[in-house]
Every structure is written in C-alpha cells, then in structure tokens.
Amino acid sequence: MPPGAAARDPQLPARLLRAEHDALLPILRRTPEPAFGRPTACPGWSVRDVLAHCGSALSRVVTGELHAFTPELNEIDVAERRAWPLARVLSELADGYLTAGPLIGGAGGRLDGVALGEWVHGGDVRAALGEPLAYESDGFCDACVLLGERSRRRETPLVEASLPGGDLQLGILKPGRPAATLRSSNAALIRLFAGRPVEPGDYRLVGATPEELVIF
C-alpha cells in the first residue's frame, strides 16, 4: 500500500484501465440487457448511463475533445448515447479502456482523475448489478495511488487510513488540525472519498466528517 506522496508513475493510468477492461467487460457481456436499466449510486443514471458516460469520457481523451466534465455536460454526452445499441456503448467503452490509458499517462497528471473516475464508476456498476468486489476490484492499489494524489490536489484534510492490506495517508495536513484517522474496509474507503453511500458499520472515522473527504 502506498504510504503517501511519491513520484508519479506514468504507466499507472493505463495499467488501471487495462485491469478494469479485463475484469469488468466479461461481467457486462454476460449480463442480461434488462439489468443495464438498474439504478446506480449516480443520481438519475442507470447502469447503461454510467457506462455511456465512461465510454464518452475516454473517447474525449482519445480525440482531445475534452470538456469540463460537469454534470450538465456529462448528461449531454450520455443523452446522445441513449439511442445507441447496447453493443455500441460497450464497444466504445472497451476501446477507450485500451487506448486512453497511455494518453492519460502522458498528460503529466492532469487527466489522472479520469482514470480514477473510470475505476470508481466500475464499482458503481458492480454494486448496481449485485456483483462482488464493488470498489475493491482488480487495480485497487493503483486506484489508491491516484486517490492519494487527487486528495492532495483537492486539499482534503489529512487522513491516516488503516485498511486490511496496510496503511495509507490521504489529503494534506491543515494548520492547527491533527490528522484524522480512518479504519475501514477497502470498499468503504473508496465509497467515502468518492461520495458514495457507505454503511456506518464499515468504517470508523475520527477527526473529520465524510463530507470533507469527497474528491469528486
């Protein structure tokens, strides 16, 4: 487990997206089409909508047609894809997982949040479909590296997290404020920092509120 800030690994985004490609796509290809209409943790979006957003974001990285990824602009991208056959949505996503990673890696950290967001959305999809390992699937350790980097960029309060696999520092030290402590499952850590619903019994946070940790 990464202890804190470290030199950026430009191969990490591609590695994380490849892991998600290899783990999530087989699940999606065996999922009955009606299940893609299930609601997710993303307000107003179905499983299909989340996947459409993921594919569109990766396509924008590949084409260089980036926008601010606000909720309004994301919804426009998703709405454009609601008329697509499901197979086309999944094809765009699969291609994006494999082609966007090196471009994100070469962007010097500016687009790392896209890679992390894609992996988190994979957790949203797994949770909605009742699949195991939601928010703790293959690539978890790489996702934690990006989570740490993003938490420092967003200047969330310093949190010393104790996880089943080791310890992790996130955020930055605030003047006059001691580090918060978090003991949680792997999935609860991601849920907290991504602003997803989390069972109170899955974590113990002292010295900060869940709302202060959200990085998206």
Label every model-predicted segment.
Residues 2-13, 37, 66-68, 105-216:
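Structured surface interface patches that mediate subunit assembly and partner/cofactor docking
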Residues 46-47, 85, 185:
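Short, structural beta-strand-to-alpha-helix junction motif
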Residues 21, 44-47:
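Surface/interface-facing alpha-helical segments and adjacent flexible terminal/loop regions used
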